[in-house]
Curated annotation (Swiss-Prot):
<dbReference type="GO" id="GO:0006207">
    <property type="term" value="P:'de novo' pyrimidine nucleobase biosynthetic process"/>
</dbReference>
<dbReference type="GO" id="GO:0044205">
    <property type="term" value="P:'de novo' UMP biosynthetic process"/>
</dbReference>
<dbReference type="GO" id="GO:0004590">
    <property type="term" value="F:orotidine-5'-phosphate decarboxylase activity"/>
</dbReference>
<keyword id="KW-0210">Decarboxylase</keyword>
<dbReference type="InterPro" id="IPR014732">
    <property type="entry name" value="OMPdecase"/>
</dbReference>
<feature type="binding site">
    <location>
        <position position="214"/>
    </location>
    <ligand>
        <name>substrate</name>
    </ligand>
</feature>
<comment type="subunit">
    <text>Homodimer.</text>
</comment>
<feature type="binding site">
    <location>
        <position position="19"/>
    </location>
    <ligand>
        <name>substrate</name>
    </ligand>
</feature>
<dbReference type="InterPro" id="IPR013785">
    <property type="entry name" value="Aldolase_TIM"/>
</dbReference>
<comment type="pathway">
    <text>Pyrimidine metabolism; UMP biosynthesis via de novo pathway; UMP from orotate: step 2/2.</text>
</comment>
<feature type="binding site">
    <location>
        <position position="215"/>
    </location>
    <ligand>
        <name>substrate</name>
    </ligand>
</feature>
<feature type="binding site">
    <location>
        <position position="194"/>
    </location>
    <ligand>
        <name>substrate</name>
    </ligand>
</feature>
<feature type="active site" description="Proton donor">
    <location>
        <position position="71"/>
    </location>
</feature>
<dbReference type="InterPro" id="IPR011060">
    <property type="entry name" value="RibuloseP-bd_barrel"/>
</dbReference>
<keyword id="KW-0456">Lyase</keyword>
<dbReference type="InterPro" id="IPR018089">
    <property type="entry name" value="OMPdecase_AS"/>
</dbReference>
<feature type="binding site">
    <location>
        <position position="124"/>
    </location>
    <ligand>
        <name>substrate</name>
    </ligand>
</feature>
Amino acid sequence: MSRAPLPLAAHERLIFALDVPSHDEAIAWVDRLGDSVAFYKIGMELLASGEYFHVLDALAKRDKRVFVDLKFFDIPATVAGTIRRLAQWPVSYCTVHGWHAGMLQAAADANHGAMRLLAVTVLTSMGRPDLAAMGIDREPVDVVVERALAAEAAGIDGVIASGQEAGPIRRATGPAFSIVCPGIRPGGPVADDQQRIVGVAQAFTDGADAIVVGRPIRLAADPAAAAAAIQAEILAAVGQDRS
């Protein structure tokens, strides 16, 4: 059974995707954004830099929440061992692929409540043609909800999924199940590699607990102001005390 969603203040519901190649660039972004962002996602690009855990430690020392987005996908024993080691670090969220029930169960058993584990369902860069090319001739929403239910049954705490599926996931799963949505585009659709996108208010109206935003902040003329504007939208959508 999944646990209650991670208690989040309104300003912690914006997660900035720290998709940069080095420790120095990562910390420069944290300093640039200041109090406008309290939660950071660190992924594979920083892992390849060799400085991943230096960044994680630096974020923790700045009292920032950390989302480890490495999408673990391996045999159950390997994933379980990785989760046990990662649980020693100050991590709030961590992703595992949601396509193998035995692996999900092993991850949940190894976690012992240290982090909130999120199952990756269908990447927001994928649409129905991409699923069909993998031999899955179904709508993304149907696959996402199926994966969310399997993750919940395995004891995983939530999913990372497009805001387009937040409503169906919320209706299908229990109130303790966390929904974190990437592919958020505050200014509306743009020409990039994300396909299944929504706006800030819509994601929270449909049941998201937190959103991941990268390029709309990173490419803004004033990134801190862009983050602050998103924070204002979140506060209007969820209020100060929703958890």
